[in-house]
Amino acid sequence: MTAPAPPSAAASDAGAPPAFAPYVPDRESPRELTLRAVLLGTVLGIVFGASSLYLFLKVGMTVSASIPVAVLAITIFRALSGAIGSPRATILENNVVQTAGSAGESIAFGVGATMPALMILGYDMDPLRVMLVSILGGILGILMMIPLRRAFIVKQHGTLPYPEGTACAKILIAGEQGGSSARTVFTGFGVAFVYQVLMEAMKLWSKEPAKLITGIKGYDKAVIATEASPTLLGVGYIIGLRTASVMVGGGILASLVLIPAIAYFGQGFTTPLAPATSALIRDMGPDEIRGTYVRYIGAGAVAAGGIISMCRALPLIVASLVGGLRSMRGNGGLQVDMSGRTERDMPISVVILGSLALVGAIAATGLIPTNAVGRVVGAGMILLFGFLFVTVSSRLTGEIGSSSNPISGMTIATLLLTCLIFYMLGWVGVEYRVAALSIAAIVCIASSNGGTTSQDLKTGFLVGATPRAQQWAIIVGAITSAVVIGFTLLLLNNVYTDVTDKPEYLPRMSAPAEAIADAPTATGPDGKTYRVWWVNKGSDLAQPGKYLVDETGKPAYRIDPGINGVVKTRADGSEATKFTPPQPALFAVIIDGILTGELPWVLVVLGAFLAIVIQLAGVSALAFAVGVYLPLATTLPIFLGGIIRGFVDRRHRMTAEESDSSPAILYSSGLIAGGSIAGILMAVREVWPWLKRTLDLSPYLPAGWSERPGPAVIAFGLLALTLLWTGLRAKPAVAAVGSIDGNGSAAR
């Protein structure tokens, strides 16, 4: 198909859309929104949504699932066609699959970033709340983005590149020629899955080899460790050497500078240094120092980094909002042209009424647990902040891509504004903390899914899809993914929850009689029945959390959650597995700091100024801050993946576009998915102790083998070599196939 000539200046000035010829012409109507496409898309969305949630809980970030989902759709349909003789899938069916399948990753980010903060504040993570927030936020983001499609996708085609959406369109067009790319994804998935099972279930080598630095007087609490994880290795390759280097720099500062410095200067203290309440610094290990002091420094740095990234994008944010509102007032917004197939959006009446119905449901279902006035105010803030940040997110993903979209910064802004409004209204009671978090969670999920929806609609615009079909597909994908992601979050938290009776984790005072009079009961590890005592943030009775107390109120056990928990060692002496994403802790700090005023502000401010210094030095403050918050063991394997990508890119002299579509990127996507799914299954294994004991081969190995660093380093090195070999053996072919020409027209 011959590309049309560029539009004239007059046409451009008149606001007419640029001349564009998609891959599938408007006059053709191939199969698109079919049952098989929607079913496959929802299944892949569930798989990648669950794996994205696991990844987020590990490192506080996710990676786009659109490209691997598109590749898998092409190959699976091709295989089914050959095996059972079903009709070959059209490119538009494949596009529906990737559209429905992409919702899981964006919802996973929003849910993982916000919902665990409930437990840090001292509340239970109610399953119904998690499900409703996930579903309502996901659908709201889609509906609010639909009126912006013509403004951002059509009228600004050629101005807003939408990098991931354009790359996915190239994958779909290239998929008409073969399926070798999918084999690369499946290979990475299989390698990572087997590796994770051998390491975590069979315990053939250590999951986290570590070395305590010794030999320097006074420098005795610095630990170099790495998590031998295929998931983190894949993440490092995808985000690249620059970002991976910045993250590991933050990890080095925290583990090899801040922790040893605090230990050195605090070794002479004879009283606890706040926020510690009982332990002396000289008696703390590296993990305790991190949890007591460095965690708040990291939270302050993450908050400042998120705000900085949002401020840097402020001109784009203002332009996005003004442009979106202007376009909706003109012929590009509410008056949708229904004459052509590729212009058919979901009816605007459905969008408006659906958005209002969702907000009404939020106010009516008790998601905002306040009085009637508080619910109405909260629903209004969701509507206002939701549309604001969905507009911002949709525009920014077009400008800088999903990976650089500052969703965390938008959520911080929402939470700050919400808490300040509550504070000015005098709403500082216990219920308003949950209300503030619920508002921020819905806005976070909506803005995240709004950005993903815009990328999907860009892909559809390039390949010639029907927008309405895509919009229904991603709504179905959002609902199914949200339900599974909610269950996955609860599963991962519950199976890694620990019950401890160690005195250092228990309150020194008894629970008030009125606090446990009507409390539910639970059975403790000793078989006795106890009352459940929830201690919320702001209480001076005990650290926030869940406790089991006897009838007199005396604490007997602490129920420590699997996400952002504080217990490091189980009762049997084994290491407790915990997820420590930075965002939930940060959001809890913001709510606690504004509504209760009780916060170690000195440490938070130190972290904020640290982020400012890093930004002034020309380095991404947010990536560095995440590195400060996460353990060095998490950022080191990410750094190794980044080093491998840097070497491969230099060896092949690839452009950024070629590198982003290379075989090693697809292999890394497989590593992430395979390692994450295996990790989720390892969590399920905790439910059946007999299965856990059966798979454990460490008793048959030499004494101490599974704890030695050597076997883990060798195994992880071999895994890294498979990634290096994949990157070196072939240059990408995708970028050259089905390319988008200078006018943005798809060459067919």
Regions found by a protein language model. Name each.
Residues M1-R748:
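Alpha-helical multipass membrane-protein architecture
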